């Protein structure tokens, strides 16, 4: 989930070449801020600057940012400013789409970025920190993005005593050593998505304090809807057995594995009305050309392409759907499926579980937190490989399923309707326990400690 981040960058970041760029850079002369930031003095409140994806986006990062901010806005002793990046002017949002709490100050990082690059506003952040003088700067993203912000902050040699916290999105079992060194050198505190990811960091030598900040489920937004009515509106046969994948068509999501598994499944059961719905592009944005791949897989199996060609459905648009639209897709399907070779949380599958739809997912990463044999089909990822930075800027150890194993996992719900129904009910029951209030509690606790320390020093 990282819209418009280049994932095929052949250039190794400067901060990965040498830690000198982090710890020994000369100060950068920064022009005065043009941002509409809060005053440096906020009536004795603790000041937090959250650096993350703007809430007016269609990515998982934006959803999580919104969930966190809404909880933090309830704290009367906390002043919150959001340095929200990658809100692109060409994107249109409906009125009322993720309205920010009135007491959260918002800085549009993409708008401030001159000249415009990728909309992150890396070089503008030091200016904002100098103007706002926050007690805590908290950066949320994967380490390739976090690292670029840290480099710019370090170059600026900022005055003041702000602390740097990192909400670290991990998708693979290993982080590159340069990123680990950066966290140990620069971060005062780290937050991981799950206990599993926390232990993963600790096992790689992280010495900084690590807390767990999970994700929450928006039960007022994602809720069960009548499936038959949805299918009628979408012109999908009521008797169809529909699998759904809402992930973007990008390398980590391994749509090639999904298409191979699906082709095997439809050929194995030619008389069953099996369909796959993918809410992504067809391949024109640099991912897999899904229809070409599917056609080839059918030909390799010696079947008539016309017989099964219409079983793969790909949305005509992607990255434009409102949360309410996504809820409709979730409810349209019988089963959700994920074929990724690394997953930090698995937000799409998590949300679909929340409306009562069971999932077929790899037994990796964030899925281990909320998926079990009682609410999902967990497929073992038997293939392991290491990613070069030319392929992924975060590198790491990927774990992928064999397409045949994924096919067998998808087959379980196709052939056992009672298991599918039972798992769907259990999935919803599980996910409903993940509230944002519960998720943000560890962060609130740490912020409260900082507020008490600040008051004691006053």
Descriptions of predicted regions:
Residues 49-50, 237-253, 259-262, 276-278:
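Conserved donor-binding/catalytic core segment of Leloir-type glycosyltransferases
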Residues 341:
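Aromatic "clamp/platform" in nucleotide-sugar-dependent glycosyltransferases that forms part
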Residues 222-236:
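A short helix/loop element that forms part of the nucleotide-sugar donor recognition site in Leloir-type
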Residues 196, 216:
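Carbohydrate-associated surface elements
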Residues 288-328:
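Nucleotide-activated donor-binding/catalytic signature segment of Leloir-type glycosyltransferases, i.e.
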Residues 401, 405-406, 415-445:
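A charged, aromatic-enriched C-terminal amphipathic alpha-helix characteristic of glycosyltransferases
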Residues 15-22, 436-458:
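C-terminal alpha-helical cap of glycosyltransferases
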